[in-house]
Amino acid sequence: MTVKASYAFLLEQSFVVPHCVWKWRPVYGDLYWDATWSQFTFSNFLRTAVDLSWKITHGVLHNLDRLASFGYTNLKNCYCGQSGESLEHLFYSCPLAQSVLGWVSVLFLSAVPDCPSLRPRHVLFGFSSEELSRVPKVFAVILILYKWSIWLARNDYHFGDRRPCVDDVLASLKAHICFVVRCHFRKSWNDRRAFVKHWSANGLLASVHGDSLLVKI
């Protein structure tokens, strides 16, 4: 029996509802957890970014609010000046987050005009199953990479006294997106149609020319 089969068997025999389900219900209501978990498997590149999103989803990321709940004092404010640092503030409401999300939203709405604007639930938990039926996979991964880029800038501020710049965060995000798109281009050499649909967003992010790829961002 494989490790995967053993783990699946144990889950069936002793299923426990993850703590995050109860943690976030008073704030965001009943969420689409199966869809959230599935989005962590869309890309196996940049695993550290996926791990960060997993911590965010479970509410165990060591942001300022969580550190304060452990009794830590003399913590810096957020780089925007607000005291405290909730996950929603850091990744959605903060002016830096809003500026970078503005660029992401333009891409998203260009690819899927009939989908709703990005809300906190999208940023923290990804897309619902219904939305995923219309949204190319690359956008679920872009949200993961977006949070990773914001987190890197946040850590540079708290541990290196380097105030974040929108242009630097955007450059980091674009570089990570290009890397992932190119990796999936090489991985899907025998299924270009799936690549064009899910990873180039039907030509919005990249175009295929024979065996070469032109990334447009």
Named regions from a protein language model:
Residues 26-41, 117-134:
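Short amphipathic alpha-helical segments and their helix-coil junctions
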Residues 68-119, 124-125:
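Short Cys/His-based metal-binding microdomains
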Residues 1-84, 149, 215-217:
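Helix/loop segments that flank and initiate small ligand/metal-binding modules
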Residues 190-217:
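C-terminal helix/juxtamembrane-tail motif
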Residues 133-161:
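Short flanking/linker segments adjacent to small metal-binding domains or redox-active Cys/His motifs
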Residues 69-71, 93-95, 164-169, 187-194:
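Short amphipathic alpha-helical segments embedded in low-complexity Lys/Glu-rich regions
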Residues 164-181:
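Short secondary-structure subsegments characteristic of cysteine-rich extracellular domains
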Residues 64-66, 101-106, 150-162:
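Short amphipathic alpha-helical interface patches used for protein-protein assembly/oligomerization
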